[in-house]
Amino acid sequence: MKHILFLLTSIALLLSACAPLTKSSNATPSPTPLPQPILDPGYAQDAPSTATPPTDPTPFDPAPVSSGLLPADETNTYWAVNPSSGSRLFVRVAYPRAWNGELVPALVLVPGGTGATEPRKAEALAAEGFLVIIFDPEGRGRSEGTEDYNGFIGQDGLAAVIEAATALPGLDANRYGLVSYSYGVTLATGALARHPDLPIDFYIDWEGPVDRTYTTTGCGANRAGGIQWQACSNESWWAEREALNFIAEVRVPYQRIQSQTDHVQPTNNHAIDIVNAAVAGGVPWVRLNEYPAGQTYDATNQPAMLPDSMDKQIDRTVATYARYIIETVVNQ
């Protein structure tokens, strides 16, 4: 009997020695994700906003720009985070064809209407020697969120893209411009006015509608284009979406590009309106096309605008004006 008990005990010891070890609970933890880029919530305090307020109202410094852009799924594509909505905004970057790693002038392009990124424009301006940043505004293209029609939330998103993009290799922060097309003027002027510390050196506006009358092409029942569904009597809605509300607060050189025949409007009065408002508001340098800077104009006796053929060369015109402003205004 003793021999049997001894044999059973020996077998039990052998089985326990061969059993797999229990996995330690002290395994190396997964790396902590990098913080999402956040901008100073104080940016949105200059005017009432429909944006969701930050959960922590305590003031804090902006996140380091090195964490500002998160890589997306293609080469030279990224995500920036809109601090007002938490939405990820899709960003694409185009470099000059012969870029060798040196610092080059940069442009952020704001699309017209309720459009998204336009890679063709980016490539055309990159061919002119610029590093070009394009993006899908809130709720458009590949970006998250809900369409904001260039209101405060959209403006905060543009500000986040501008700030975050300063981390891009090759971007010269001393030659960094903003370019808007058509209704993009609302997004651009709102971002510059409400975020006065943005690292933008100059602003170029192509034929932007400057208030609700132009944006709706007349505010009447038979509107020809623009935002058809929003009543012009909705003061709170339009207060966020009229460039004339913001232009006087812009503190960088401003260039207006205007063709003789506007791409939407029946007159060019809107160009006169915004240039005059910019000069009256003390914008540091204001120019209409190639006329002397600082001039104001009479809408009933307008100067000749650019020939309509220039619309087919708009990318080259933007590049020419950007180089002129950099060389004669920004770097002086």
PLM region descriptions:
Residues E102-G112:
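Short beta-strand element of the alpha/beta-hydrolase
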Residues G281-Q332:
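C-terminal catalytic histidine-bearing segment of alpha/beta-hydrolase fold enzymes
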Residues D148-P169:
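Alpha/beta-hydrolase active-site loop
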Residues D201, G208-F246:
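Mobile cap/lid helix-loop segments that gate and shape the active-site cleft of serine hydrolases
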Residues P48-N100:
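N-terminal cap/lid segment of alpha/beta-hydrolase-fold proteins
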Residues V250, R256-S259:
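Short beta-strand/loop motif that positions the catalytic acidic residue
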Residues L13, C18-L70, A221:
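Ser/Thr-rich, Proline-interspersed low-complexity disordered segments
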Residues A126-E144:
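Conserved alpha/beta-hydrolase
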